[in-house]
Amino acid sequence: MLSSVVIAASEEQHNPLIPEPADIVGSLICFVVILFFFWKLVLPRVKKLLDERAEAIEGNIAKADEAQHKAEALLEEYTAQLAEARADAAKIREQARTDGQKIVAEAKDTATAEAARVTASAQAQIEAERQTALVSLRGEVGSLAIDIASGVVGEVLTEDKKAQAIVDRFLADLEASEKATSNEKAGTAN
């Protein structure tokens, strides 16, 4: 059996792990041809395609940056316009408030002036009516006093100027004493 192993080893058989030299040369020629076609045809197309993609990506990035800058500029402009609109609205509100206060003040002044005018007119009318009533009352009091005096004396007294002057003086003294009394009451109340 040992002899058969030695015989088998002595016969040279081909090792499947080491290729034949003719196979190596043929494979090398095919590899070089494929490499040449790949180098001349496929690689430039792939490189061109990658360059186009890179340019497209860079262009999109540039467009995105430009759009972002435009958006930021528009945002700043919008913010400025919004701030300006708010300032204008504040001015308008303040102007309206000021105008409202002026209108209220004018209305108060007008109402106060009207009230003062009405009060003065009423006081003047009251004073005129008081004077009219006082003159009428003096005349009637004078007539009554003369009639009473005529009844006491038993003679008919005429309404002459002297009698009228006495009655007027008496009424004036009466008014003066009433004013003095009211002033004394006002002085003690304080």
From Swiss-Prot:
Domain of life: Bacteria
Membrane topology: Single-pass membrane protein
Example of a GO cellular component annotation carried by this entry: plasma membrane
Segments passing through the bilayer: 24-44
One Pfam family in the UniProt entry: ATP-synt_B
Record keywords: ATP synthesis, Cell membrane, CF(0), Hydrogen ion transport, Ion transport, Membrane, Transmembrane, Transmembrane helix, Transport
Record-level Gene Ontology MF annotations: proton-transporting ATP synthase activity, rotational mechanism; proton-transporting ATPase activity, rotational mechanism
Compartments (UniProt record): Cell membrane
Chief location: membrane
Record has RNA-binding as a keyword: no
Family: Belongs to the ATPase B chain family.
Summary of the function given for this chain in its UniProt record: F(1)F(0) ATP synthase produces ATP from ADP in the presence of a proton or sodium gradient. F-type ATPases consist of two structural domains, F(1) containing the extramembraneous catalytic core and F(0) containing the membrane proton channel, linked together by a central stalk and a peripheral stalk. During catalysis, ATP synthesis in the catalytic domain of F(1) is coupled via a rotary mechanism of the central stalk subunits to proton translocation.
NCBIfam families: ATP_synt_b, PRK05759.1-3
PANTHER family: ATP SYNTHASE SUBUNIT B (PTHR33445:SF1), ATP SYNTHASE SUBUNIT B', CHLOROPLASTIC (PTHR33445)
Assembly and interaction partners: F-type ATPases have 2 components, F(1) - the catalytic core - and F(0) - the membrane proton channel. F(1) has five subunits: alpha(3), beta(3), gamma(1), delta(1), epsilon(1). F(0) has three main subunits: a(1), b(2) and c(10-14). The alpha and beta chains form an alternating ring which encloses part of the gamma chain. F(1) is attached to F(0) by a central stalk formed by the gamma and epsilon chains, while a peripheral stalk is formed by the delta and b chains.
Name of the protein: ATP synthase subunit b
Species assigned in the record: Leifsonia xyli subsp. xyli (strain CTCB07)
Gene giving rise to this polypeptide: atpF
